[in-house]
């Protein structure tokens, strides 16, 4: 019995050591499924339509193809073709045909498709990475920062900056760092979109910027974009390191050994 357990354990360790790292990654769910959009019943017509096609030629005493005493093709006592007590063709208690019990035509239908629900995983992911700005093509808005103290080389510009720094942005727009090859590209894109968006928004409110304002704004935003890049890079590498750590063969062996001790 002990040799059998030892042999099984050696086989498990061998398989775990050579297992593909890709198995640790979460596979995307296939598309489709229940309540994923589209018509669940593509072959159905409107609920108020005829459930049976009209039949030509009736029997004895049928002027328009119905039963005995049916002037317009319905059941007994049906003036316009419906079930018992149906004046215009429908189910019992249906005044104008079609639908289930208590349904007048297309009004008050049962089993309506439910409204699509918000995917909370996507909401949580967006909240963790930053607020996604829909009108800016996938850019995210970073958290608020303290405006840096910058010296511009002259007393006039330094004083002007201290007096007007509250008019400059304290948040930057950016894309995920994995979409850029280096820090310079990230910062360049971050500065351009942030200055442009802030200028347009502020100008719409009736406030204009001078050339001095634009110059200082670019310097301020550049420093904040560098800070944002450092934050995002650190978080990105930490996530990558965690994935590599838990998918390495030694860690898999250790976890398998602990599971064996607990179960055995």
Curated annotation (Swiss-Prot):
Propiece residues: 242-264
Subcellular localization(s) per the UniProt record: Cell membrane; Golgi apparatus
Binding site for Cu(2+) 3: 88-90
Extent of the signal sequence: 1-24
Domain of life: Eukaryota
Biased composition (Gly residues): 55-107
Disulfide bonds listed in the record: 190-225
InterPro entries, per the entry: Prion, Prion/Doppel_b-ribbon_dom_sf, Prion/Doppel_prot_b-ribbon_dom, Prion_copper_b_octapeptide, Prion_N
One Gene Ontology cellular component: plasma membrane
Spans annotated as Interaction with ADGRG6: 25-41
Keyword Glycoprotein: yes
GPI-anchor amidated alanine lipid modification positions: 241
Residues covered by region (Disordered): 28-119
Interaction with GRB2, ERI3 and SYN1, as annotated region: 25-241
Stated role: Its primary physiological function is unclear. May play a role in neuronal development and synaptic plasticity. May be required for neuronal myelin sheath maintenance. May promote myelin homeostasis through acting as an agonist for ADGRG6 receptor. May play a role in iron uptake and iron homeostasis. Soluble oligomers are toxic to cultured neuroblastoma cells and induce apoptosis (in vitro). Association with GPC1 (via its heparan sulfate chains) targets PRNP to lipid rafts. Also provides Cu(2+) or Zn(2+) for the ascorbate-mediated GPC1 deaminase degradation of its heparan sulfate side chains.
Family per record: Belongs to the prion family.
Record text about domains: The normal, monomeric form has a mainly alpha-helical structure. The disease-associated, protease-resistant form forms amyloid fibrils containing a cross-beta spine, formed by a steric zipper of superposed beta-strands. Disease mutations may favor intermolecular contacts via short beta strands, and may thereby trigger oligomerization. Contains an N-terminal region composed of octamer repeats. At low copper concentrations, the sidechains of His residues from three or four repeats contribute to the binding of a single copper ion. Alternatively, a copper ion can be bound by interaction with the sidechain and backbone amide nitrogen of a single His residue. The observed copper binding stoichiometry suggests that two repeat regions cooperate to stabilize the binding of a single copper ion. At higher copper concentrations, each octamer can bind one copper ion by interactions with the His sidechain and Gly backbone atoms.
UniProt subunit comment: Monomer and homodimer. Has a tendency to aggregate into amyloid fibrils containing a cross-beta spine, formed by a steric zipper of superposed beta-strands. Soluble oligomers may represent an intermediate stage on the path to fibril formation. Copper binding may promote oligomerization. Interacts with GRB2, APP, ERI3/PRNPIP and SYN1. Mislocalized cytosolically exposed PrP interacts with MGRN1; this interaction alters MGRN1 subcellular location and causes lysosomal enlargement. Interacts with APP. Interacts with KIAA1191. Interacts with ADGRG6.
Protein name: Major prion protein
Organism: Bos taurus (Bovine)
């Amino acid at each position: 019995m002990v040799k059998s357990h030892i042999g099984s354990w050696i086989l498990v360790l061998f398989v775990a050591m050579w297992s593909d790292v890709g198995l640790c990654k979460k596979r995307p769910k296939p598309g489709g499924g229940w309540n994923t959009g589209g018509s669940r019943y593509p072959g159905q017509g409107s609920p108020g339509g005829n459930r049976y096609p009209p039949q030509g030629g009736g029997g004895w005493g049928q002027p328009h193809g119905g039963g005995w005493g049916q002037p317009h093709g319905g059941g007994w006592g049906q003036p316009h073709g419906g079930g018992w007590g149906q004046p215009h063709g429908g189910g019992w208690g249906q005044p104008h045909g079609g639908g289930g019990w208590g349904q007048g035509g297309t009004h008050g239908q049962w089993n309506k498709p439910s409204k699509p629900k918000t995917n909370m995983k996507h909401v949580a992911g967006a909240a963790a990475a930053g607020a996604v700005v829909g009108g800016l093509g996938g850019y995210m808005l970073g958290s608020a920062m303290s405006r840096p103290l910058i010296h511009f080389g002259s007393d006039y510009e330094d004083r002007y900056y201290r007096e007007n720094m509250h008019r400059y942005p304290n948040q930057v727009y950016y894309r995920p760092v994995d979409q850029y090859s280096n820090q310079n590209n990230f910062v360049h894109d971050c500065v351009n979109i942030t200055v442009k968006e802030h200028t347009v928004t502020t100008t719409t409110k009736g406030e204009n910027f001078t050339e001095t304002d634009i110059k200082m704004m670019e310097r301020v935003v550049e420093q904040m974009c560098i800070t944002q890049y450092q934050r995002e890079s650190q978080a990105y590498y930490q996530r990558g390191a965690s994935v590599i750590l838990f998918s390495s063969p030694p860690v898999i062996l250790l976890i398998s050994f602990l599971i064996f001790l607990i179960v055995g």
